[in-house]
A protein has these predicted regions:
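Terminal, membrane-proximal amphipathic helices
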Residues: 1-119, 144-271
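Internal active-site segments that recognize and position negatively charged phosphoryl groups
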Residues: 132-139
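Transmembrane alpha-helix interface/packing and boundary motifs in multi-pass membrane proteins
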Residues: 119-132
Length: 271
């Protein structure tokens, strides 16, 4: 199908995001965290750093387990119907105009970012003992967020086969770098081809991607740990935990939003 003028405008927005520098929010947190980073170096043990990193690795490794992908789409379908977008299944939504789907997807942002921030603030008050416990909750919220946004555009991202796509979105969110965004959009293109051809999505098959897929958890962990360990600093813990969780979930929402829109447009062009 040919893209409409509205579709082409969205494509330009995606390209702007793809080539942009790190977000203002990410830069602000890096600046604000400078004194905390100094305190971390002085007070946080290597064992604590390793524990947090391991928790991130453990969660991302569970994405090969089908039980981790449980997701109820009824709330998405109900929200779509309230907006005049009736659909019997999630897949039906991909036949709606993208200008109607964008507000539906954006409606998923606020609840998830607040939920993640509250979790980060609560565990931050508990200090070192609970910083690692915060990681599974944060990533569970963000996995569901990615699935919700994908569903808003008519693409049910359910099952371990979507692990490469989800990891690439997490990596784009955590790193904020252009190469990570490029990698995510390349993965989106593969997924779009699978959806358009009614084929099973298998992720990119090049040796280079297989190598990167193994490294993604490590890269995501590195980007987050430098910020998350600030929760172990006395008095700063709750504020740092809440702000970092809010930042990461907001970045995940934006990355998933752009990737889901790209998936919609790539699929549409192939039909």
């Amino acid at each position: 199908m040919r893209l409409t003028d509205e579709d082409k405008a969205v494509r330009r927005e995606i390209e702007d995001w793809q080539h942009a520098d790190a977000s203002v929010a990410a830069q602000a947190i890096d600046w604000a965290m400078t004194p905390v980073d100094w305190a971390v170096d002085k007070t946080v043990s290597p064992e604590t750093m390793e524990k947090v990193t391991d928790r991130i690795h453990q969660f991302l490794s569970t994405l090969t387990d089908a039980s981790e992908w449980t997701h109820e789409a009824d709330d998405i379908l109900a929200a779509a119907e309230e907006r005049g977008l009736p659909a019997q299944t999630v897949s039906d939504l991909r036949h709606q105009p993208i200008t109607e789907l964008d507000p539906l997807a954006r409606s998923r942002f606020r609840q998830n970012t607040i939920l993640a921030a509250l979790g980060g603030g609560g565990t931050g008050l508990a200090g070192t003992a609970f910083i690692a416990a915060d990681i599974p909750l944060l990533f569970t919220i963000n996995l569901r967020l990615i699935q919700q946004i994908g569903a808003c555009y008519g693409f049910p991202l359910e099952g371990p086969m979507f692990r490469p796509l989800v990891l690439s979105i997490f990596n784009a969110a955590a790193s904020g770098g252009r190469e990570a965004r490029n990698e995510a959009l390349r993965e989106v293109s593969v997924a779009a081809a699978a959806f358009a051809g009614d084929l099973d999505y298998k992720g990119r098959v090049s040796g280079t991607f297989r190598d990167q897929n193994r490294h993604f958890p490590r890269e995501i962990a590195k980007a987050l740990v430098e910020r998350k360990v600030g929760q172990t600093i006395p008095l700063a813990g709750a504020a740092v935990g809440a702000s970092v969780n809010y930042w990461f979930t907001n970045e995940t929402a934006k990355s998933a939003f752009m990737c889901a829109r790209a998936l919609y447009l790539d699929w549409k062009e192939r039909k």
